[in-house]
Amino acid sequence: MGARASRHRQSPDQSQSQSPSPHHKHHHHHQTTRAPKPKPKPQPPPPQQPRSQPPPPPRHQPQQAPQQAAAEDGVGRVLGRPMEDVRATYTFGRELGRGQFGVTYLATHKPTGRRYACKSIAARKLARPDDLDDVRREVHIMHHLTGHRNIVELRGAYEDRHSVNLVMELCEGGELFDRIIARGHYSERAAAALCREIVSVVHSCHSMGVMHRDLKPENFLFLNKREDSPLKATDFGLSVFFKPGEQFRDLVGSAYYVAPEVLKRLYGAEADIWSAGVILYILLSGVPPFWAENEDGIFDAVLQGHIDFSSEPWPSISSGAKDLVKRMLRQDPKERLTAAEILNHPWIREDGEAPDKPLDITVISRMKQFRAMNKLKKVALKVVAENLSEEEIVGLKEMFKSLDTDNSGTITLEELRAGLPKLGTKISESELRQLMEAADVDGNGSIDYVEFISATMHMNRLEKEDHIYKAFEYFDKDHSGFITVDELEEALTKYDMGDEATIKEIIAEVDTDHDGRINYQEFVAMMKNNSPEIVPNRRRMF
């Protein structure tokens, strides 16, 4: 199981009982890989906004009825104004990142040549009224929060028949952890400065009636590569407007960062403070405070709430830092500090008591291991799926054909929704969406045959020795019994993962005897290891 929470969103009184399994950003990534989004120069083009700056709308907005008719009249279903082609104003370049709901591209403003990031959400992924509300809410919230130094600025929102496009300032300074790792030296004072920027975002959101609900390191990017670059919060896809004291019930977020009251399905804005506290713990130690072999184990650890301050490097970390972490990670939300109180804590203040002595170098190496996802395992899973025999997958093949009602060679969300009950599979709407998002590896809104097989094959098939050996042979081109750096690069280039940094990450993660290559025993151990990752593995569908 992955360590990422569900990206399906509901308003609080619409929440239905779901399996408590946040699945995600992820990022990823990956999206939870997040798209870097650099800052425009002064005098940017006038933002393309709703005709008047909207106040926070009620979560239950009246539906535009009929939605389809609106689209046919040339009025966008999401933004509620005449459709406009973003490509008339911006030239799209390379892909910057990919998430469950959209792909982010480099976008150049034609009149000025200034560069932005454009998050493009395919209209086919907005099949239900809730989906439209979610994107509409994200646009409203980003406009509502505009102007804060540490929140990415939305420059314009465009909608045509094929997609909704959000043009934002481009952050080219990289992810939070990447900057720390690349710098190689790090202190409590540096951690305090970063935490101050993160909590400043939380304080601004809460004071303006917005709960973020998905705070994690991957959702913070540096604006540029300068040492004094501001840190920017970039993803408000799970955010909601709230009133003081209002409680929510839908399960959202990411497993490592999710608050205990979210798992209990009754929470308010204090859940953001918990998530920020988890980030601070990682900034100081390199690992999350709640850790287990799988997602359920992480949730159990979160609910138990035991925080380790005895292992390295905690004995050498200041009492002020530990005090702040403890007060942000109180089990009872009412006992947690507010964002304003955190910013006044003596350890975090700009002129505060956080020491400037370097933290142990192992903190950075542990952070790097925690951040790196096992890309080799993901490719190996696909290799196994492609090499299963016809006899082994005959049942899955028939299942695919029965779901693919239009014989297009792909399965859409609507086909899954209609077909699974006929196969005797009871599944909630939120689980259906989690399943679709997890299986749709290339993010195109549908599941192709190989994606379907990869997602549905049972783990006991995967663990068969001959399947693992076939996957190993795929990488071990010269049959030497080892996967070398060159062989990794050759195999992963096919999947656009063959860069030097990724190869080094994989070797560091899998090569347990440190000989610079991967032997068969190390490969088997990796394939059978279920330790959670930042971005989700594909969920088993049945």
UniProtKB/Swiss-Prot annotation:
Q: How is its activity regulated?
A: Activated by calcium. Autophosphorylation may play an important role in the regulation of the kinase activity.
Stretches for region Disordered: 1-73
Q: Where does ATP bind?
A: L96, G97, R98, G99, Q100, F101, G102, V103, T104, K119
| Compositional bias (Pro residues) | 41-60
Residues the entry annotates as binding Ca(2+) 2: D440, D442, N444, S446, E451
Q: Which residues form the active site?
A: D214 (proton acceptor)
Q: What is its main location?
A: membrane
The annotated regions of Low complexity compositional bias extend over: 12-21, 61-71
The molecular function GO annotations come to:
ATP binding; calcium ion binding; calcium-dependent protein serine/threonine kinase activity; calcium/calmodulin-dependent protein kinase activity; calmodulin binding; protein serine kinase activity
Task: Indicate which residues the UniProt annotation says bind Ca(2+) 4.
Answer: D511, D513, D515, R517, E522
Induction text: By N-acetylchitooligosaccharide elicitor.
So which domain of life are we looking at? Eukaryota
Give its localization. Answer: Membrane
Protein's UniProt name: Calcium-dependent protein kinase 15
Q: Which organism is it from?
A: Oryza sativa subsp. japonica
What gene name is given for the protein in this entry?
Answer: CPK15
